[in-house]
Amino acid sequence: MCSFVRVGSPKPLQTSASPLEMSSLRRTRAPEISELGLTPEQKDDIRDRVLRGSKSPTELGFDLRLEQDRKWRERMGSSEAKSPPCHALGVGLERHTISGTPTEMGNLGLHKGSAFQGSKPLGVLPGRVGPENKGLPPRLRYGGTLHPPFSTVHASPLAAESRRRPLAWGSAWTDAVVEKQPVVGLELRKEPEKEPTCVVMNPYPEMPPKEVDIGLPQTQESDEAKNTEPLIGLVREPSECPFAQQPEEKKEPGSTEPGVEPPGNIRPIYSGKFFDRVPCWPSAGKVKPVGYRVATCLTEKLPRLMTPPEAKKYFNFRYPPAGAERVFYGRANDPQIAPYLTHGLRSKISIPMGSLINPQPITTFQQKIKDKKESIYFSHQRAPLGKSHDQTPGLPKGMDVINTTLGTPTIRELSVRDTVNPSKSFEDVLKEGQEGHDLYTVSHNDYFAGEAKNRKYNPASFHRFNLYGIPTPHFNDGRTMAKALHWLHELQMERGAKIVSKRVDDFKEKFQHKLGKVLDPIAETMNVPPGHTFGSCLHPEEYGAGDLIHYRSPDEYLRGKDHQRAVVAAARHHLKKFNHQNFDTLQVAFRHYDKKGDGVIDRAELHEACVQANLHLDKMLLDHLFDYCDVDQDGLINYLEFANFLNWKDRIPLKEHEKRVVVKGKKPDCENVTDTSMGEAEPSLLINPEDIVPKEPGSSEETLRTIQRPGDKVSHQYKTTSSEINAVVGAVPSMCHPIFGVPTIRSDISAPRIRRVSDMNNYGDEGNAYSLLHPSIFSQKGVFERDFFKTRSKEEISDILTNIGVKLSKEEFENVWNLASKKHQRGEVCVETIRNVLDELLHADLVKCKTAM
């Protein structure tokens, strides 16, 4: 018994599912090999080929049966009487192990999908069609072979039910089916016009097949094709493994535009163009998505997207519309106050310019009245606009104005054109010009251009075409022309001496500036030597401004001693460099100078040290150097003076053992022996402890203190002139002085409520450099000056104090609020006023506590 299924109208070729099954790990799983009468070696070969992904077991079994049939036909020896492809296919299908039940023989539903993916005549399968493929199952697009009973996909509910039942097929039923049906799912066409078509009927309600777009162009079906009876084919349900993973249904994208394929829809590169001869091999080239086209990109989508108002202000600030004002996005939503403000006096609106340039059209009656009013004017009568005036009032009555011509008619004999350019040939004009020329040469001396004058010489002795005289000199370089372009006196002036007027020369010498010299207009009137100085010479004082400021004595004046000071500074620098390069410590350097070892340096020792340092000084310069270093004026240079004036003490550190150096007193002079100085002097330290100071504040390194000369100290008794100005009790303070110019902080004008972007004035509400370098805690938290001085209500002030941790009772808060409201004339209170009141109350409590203690 067979059941039938209804197939939809013919459609273009669509895709089908792959015969290979996938495991749960998305790997290819080799299905069970049906019993096809194969040897164990052939079964192993089939299983290996399935695992390599070349062909499915069904395809391999089908091909093997075809090979066996081919060998059987060869053994039969009848090469001419070959079976048709459909018969060969049927023979190959006879021995398949077909799963099913006898009661459900006709329920030929298969996997998900349409019945035939578009109806075809029986015997013609989707795939490659050609004479070389007769009798062979067609191939799939993505590799593998398509078999009608095994790879065709069904979406019938009967198929789903059949998959849930345990199916068992028998060979007896298969033989019966094969006897009745030579080919499953195919049509035998020996005679197309005579053979009937074997179809399968569907006893269940018709369900429209789900169309799958493969990217090929769809042909428009006619009404006749739509109304025709759908074709029906005989199909068979394949054996299915109960553990095989079902193919997932593809979800159609929900947001695709009509007529536009989604970008993820990728077609095979050979679709509709070529036959894939080797489907198991990967295709060469790049598979491009066939989604959005150029036409889709160039098609404008309507309605256009609107920019939200929140982002529109930023766009209008950067790209304002034509003729619109560029408004900063920070004040784009501010209330428009400026357009409604009126500055000055409002002027009365006069006649607008538009009505004057383009007045409104008037009616015919108004035009008549206007012409009547203007007709009385003489200018309107004698010179009307756009036409000549009416001369009828000045002419006789009854005169035909149009046909009457006034004046004497002009007789036109020859036009100007004929006079200037007569209509004659060149020969006629030349002939007329030659007539009477001989007479004109005698009477008027009228010769043609270049014509020689006939002087009527004797032709026997003189011929007018002969040349007489010396040939004119000629040069091709143009020297003669250059000479002719200059006047004769100019050439003579160039050759002669340059004569300049005495008056002009005196004027230039007196008033013309000379390079590198000062202009002296009266230099010629001064009969004095060049180095003469006019006026009385001022002799400089012995002291200068520095001597007065430092309160120096007359013997210490520095005026006129520049050379002496420079020589002393050079000698000191030479000794400092010598000590720094040759000695490691100040003690070793001082010991080199102190030859006697008494802890001081005298003049002889300093002179000897200078000679050893290759510094030769005369007696005067040596005395100046010694006097400069001897600050206490005792005639000796001690260790502290030596370190300050003859060494770089900051470069040579002070060692620890140098602090404990002891110097023995020198022996007394035998000639001046007194009773009080009989014994030797007591030993003393080389460096006094009070002369040792830290090198830097807080540093562990120590050095000798810096001593100053008496002349370097500044007197505390002098006063500058600037300190004496306005140093009068009761004088006018400087704040009352008149101020000129524009102040930096514009406190003279009130700050605008809404400031423009171009307003760069400082109204006192901006921070200074100190606030930028040292921001307060309020600035770091984002609280600014306007937040402190903003007027707030009592509840808001109470919430602010509570949030910052200031706990006040109701009576205390009322007291603080009353004190703060009294500080403003309107009773307004801000955070700054509350802070000041709290500080005043806290200060008053501290004063009370100190008084009580």
From Swiss-Prot:
GO terms for cellular component: axonemal A tubule inner sheath; axonemal microtubule; sperm flagellum. SUPFAM superfamilies: EF-hand (SSF47473). Residues 1-31, 244-266 are annotated as: Disordered. Residues 581-616, 617-652 form the EF-hand domain. One of its GO terms (biological process) is negative regulation of protein binding. InterPro entries: EF-hand-dom_pair (IPR011992), EF_Hand_1_Ca_BS (IPR018247), EF_hand_dom (IPR002048), EFHC1/EFHC2/EFHB (IPR040193). The keyword Lyase does not apply. Microtubule inner protein component of sperm flagellar doublet microtubules. Interacts with STIM1 and ORAI1; the interactions take place upon Ca(2+)-store depletion and dissociate through a Ca(2+)-dependent mechanism. Interaction with STIM1 inhibits STIM1 interaction with SARAF. This is EF-hand domain-containing family member B. The lineage of its organism: Eukaryota, Metazoa, Chordata, Craniata, Vertebrata.
